[in-house]
Every structure is written in structure tokens, then in C-alpha cells.
Regions:
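N-terminal leader/targeting segments and the immediate start of mature chains
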Residues: 1-23
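Short secondary-structure capping/turn segments at boundaries of alpha-helices and beta-strands
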Residues: 14-18, 32-35, 48
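Short secondary-structure boundary/capping segments within folded domains
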Residues: 19-20, 37-39, 52-53
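A short, Trp-centered hydrophobic/proline-enriched beta-strand micro-motif
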Residues: 23-32
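Short acidic, glycine-rich loop/turn motifs
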Residues: 31-37, 64-66, 96-100
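Short coil-to-beta-strand transition motifs
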Residues: 36-46
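Acidic, aromatic-enriched beta-alpha/helix-loop junctions
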Residues: 45-93
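Helix-rich interaction surfaces within compact, conserved domain-sized segments
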Residues: 74-126
Length: 126
């Protein structure tokens, strides 16, 4: 596996592209603190998107869940964003490092390149 650093100046564009490519894909969201404690915020839920939390902030919002229940997790004061890739160069996980030493990972249940996906992600009825 390889990791690709995303330049801070292109976070908005990269996160927007990531969200459009992977909306509806099944992910798990975990946080690891600087002391090594691990918490799972969400497991095996559809990704809604990853974006700046607000226009005036560098904080990053991660939205996951069904259309009936959406969970949003915010990463405050991010200092680095990385994409972890499989050997086939498919996106495996998006990793966000925060100033306080916390690392938030959005990991795909089934990593694959977007062009390998057959069809359109399932959308729940409203």
C-alpha cells in the first residue's frame, strides 16, 4: 500500500472530487487519539461526503449514514490529509491528521477504483 499526501491548497477540490466519486460507498470511520485510544464513530455505513465544515474554517466534516439517520463527525484543526491506496492504486482510505494528534480514518469496506464499480450506488427512498 502507498499513501499520497494531499496538498493543503487543494483540500477543497480533492475532498469534493472524493465525495462525488465515492458517495454511497460503504465505509467505516475510526479515530485514534495521540495516546493510541481508538474509537469507532461509524461502521459499514454509506458515505455522504467529506467537505470543509464551513467556508471560514479549515475543519473537515465527514457525513455518513442512511437517508434517515446521518452522522456528521468533524475533524478540528486538521494539519494533513492523505489518501491510502491499494497495490492496484484504488482508494483504500482517507486519513485526516489533526493538530491535537488525533487521526481520523475513513476506510472503504471494498476498496476499488471508481471505474470498476458496476452501476450506480443504491439510494434509499425518502
Amino acid at each position: 500500500m502507498t499513501t499520497r499526501e494531499i496538498d493543503r491548497s487543494s483540500w477543497r477540490e480533492e475532498l469534493d472530487s472524493f465525495s462525488r466519486q465515492h458517495e454511497g460507498w460503504i465505509v467505516s470511520v475510526t479515530m485514534r487519539t495521540a495516546s493510541g485510544d481508538v474509537a469507532v464513530a461509524a461502521r459499514d455505513v454509506p458515505l455522504h461526503g467529506v467537505s470543509p465544515a464551513s467556508p471560514s474554517s479549515d475543519d473537515i466534516a465527514i457525513s455518513v449514514g442512511s437517508s434517515r439517520t446521518i452522522l456528521t463527525h468533524e475533524v478540528h484543526e486538521p494539519i494533513a490529509v492523505q489518501m491510502e491506496l491499494t497495490e492496484d492504486e484504488a482508494d483504500r482510505a482517507l486519513i485526516i491528521h489533526a493538530h491535537d494528534g488525533t487521526t481520523t480514518t475513513i476506510e472503504f469496506r471494498s476498496p476499488m477504483r471508481p471505474e470498476e464499480v458496476d452501476g450506480i450506488p443504491f439510494r434509499e427512498p425518502l
